[in-house]
């Protein structure tokens, strides 16, 4: 027994590398992509990650004797190589449930990714996936409403929802901003959206924007007979100010508000999600800052982890890449985390980047939002890839229409309805998509004009983050 108490630095793997460990149903499991410094063996690096993100410290401390390390320590229970990468491997770590505060994504992340990413023995570290056990996920409210309740609130079924980010994102007055909102909704969109960086700036204060957008919503609803919404961005510099904006939105009677969950922070986001459920507001989530965290292949955190965290913290929509537009996202990997957002039970599937089987035990789902550099020619592919339970957002693809905003909205709605109808008739959108759009444009001059403008535009770059 005295071996453990010799002074100085000890090997982590003595305590924290336990290949014989059988994971428990209540454990939180993590898959880390580890790139150790030269000369550091994989077992030591994996054990170091487990230790530093749970109970360990760099030396023996007397107070270890006052607790049961076996009960509380993280354990590296498996290590596997990464095909084609000699210097990397995947370390699997199991964390006992009791290490984490209930209902706190903030605490979960502070423990698992808080300190260990600056660790000297590692050249780089990336959290690829987390398995959240029902015992932990059940301590969260989750999304304020979820997919089915949202469809019932909006009375929209059997098709993706259509949105549009109002551009130019900064510089419009509240009155002109509201006018653009009205034109898009009147033309046939379900939603318009504040850009993520529209908060409350000198050229347009939040209260003025909220009032003019509410007016636009009610006018468009009265004229179309459809329920309309505008994502009013409640993100603010303090939590109190954020809640004040949410309360004002509720007083206006609008259906949906918005939050930037990474820049705003998980604590603020979870508070807002609770308010939204209690007051019948839908919550649209933007992922501004995600690429700072998730873009590098060898370091940071994969977006699927940020997506799972959002489902626990709470949001009804979240931006999830497009597969086809200007922001990157590899198809299988994107569909992997789209399923993690929407579905109740997701099987482990390494080809889609899903390292663990995830059971959400009836936590409401989140609608993925495809947004960024997409236009009418992408509609068949988007309908095919994302299916009905999604929001397709065309900013420039609506407001860039040569005839104006409302015709831009008409073009998108006609294209969407044509794609959904073609799919329901059994046509193959992947193969016949362009033909479907061309046929529809014969009956819609607005769509024909849009087809002409965007016929050649593509954003073609190799994806950085491939499996």
Swiss-Prot record:
One of its GO terms (cellular component) is chloroplast. Its cofactor is Mg(2+). It is an enzyme of class 4 (lyase). Binds 1 Mg(2+) ion per subunit. Transmembrane segments: none annotated. InterPro entries: RuBisCO, RuBisCo_large_chain_AS, RuBisCO_lsu_C, RuBisCO_lsu_C_sf, RuBisCO_lsu_fd_N, RuBisCO_lsu_N_sf, RuBisCO_lsuI. The modification N6-carboxylysine is found at residue 193. The basic functional RuBisCO is composed of a large chain homodimer in a 'head-to-tail' conformation. In form I RuBisCO this homodimer is arranged in a barrel-like tetramer with the small subunits forming a tetrameric 'cap' on each end of the 'barrel'. Heterohexadecamer of 8 large chains and 8 small chains; disulfide-linked. The disulfide link is formed within the large subunit homodimers. This is Ribulose bisphosphate carboxylase large chain. It comes from Cedrus atlantica (Atlas cedar).
